[in-house]
Swiss-Prot record:
PANTHER family: TETRASPANIN-8-RELATED. This is Tetraspanin-14. Belongs to the tetraspanin (TM4SF) family. One of its GO terms (cellular component) is membrane. It comes from Arabidopsis thaliana. InterPro entries: TET_plant.
Amino acid sequence: MKSQSHKPWNLVAGIFFPIITFFLSAPLVGHALYLFCMRNDHVYYRDFQSTLPRVQTLVSVSLLALFLLSNIGMFLRPRRLSYFLVIVFFIGFAYSGVYKMESRRFSPTPMCFKGEYNNGQGERKTEQYQVVKIEQSQGRLQRVHLRFVNSYALPPYDRRLLPSVKTGCCNRPGNCKLETVNATLWVTRNREGPPLETAMIYDRYGGNADIKDYYDMWRHELSVLYYDCMTCQVRIIKSPRLRKWWQFGVFLSSLTSLFR
């Protein structure tokens, strides 16, 4: 009698739980495909420019594997997946910033960014600036020079002339309606048109900046890229992109806890 009473419940669990698991885990495929397709998207960041595409590929493959294992796990014994779930659990801790020692080994995590900007004693590293020199001819972009120089090599200038350039991606210009940030660059969508009509944004050897509309400096294009690595440290750590990584870590930890 007891075995017969459990048959309807076993039937419901065997049919509906796999279906529910499939629909709940379906967004993993979408996120994996998005990260895989966007892995070659330019992220202008000095230290992680070469590592972010690899991290995105690794995360997309992991999401696909998690999708398959979560659905296969409905038909297999949980013990067969225990080792994988433990690994995913600690990876989720790393991305959410809870497991601080391991978090520094993952490039996009908040602890990794904090490790880059602090030397362990709470002091800032040597300030470096990325200087973008633009050469234009008849309104068309001809050449872009990107280089890093130490802060002491830059001559002083009037901050009032460029209220939002010195602070780079950290200070948003006043009514620009900026939408997002990709670790170094604020992006606005409501400004369209040709690149800046200026020969040089800032010159290492004392040239005067001539910018007609500094709001245009925040459009997502090479010709208007300029940022200060050091003043952006707080905003980078608290940027929306890192918020997504934190949510991803919480999701992994919660999912593995439910599987357990």
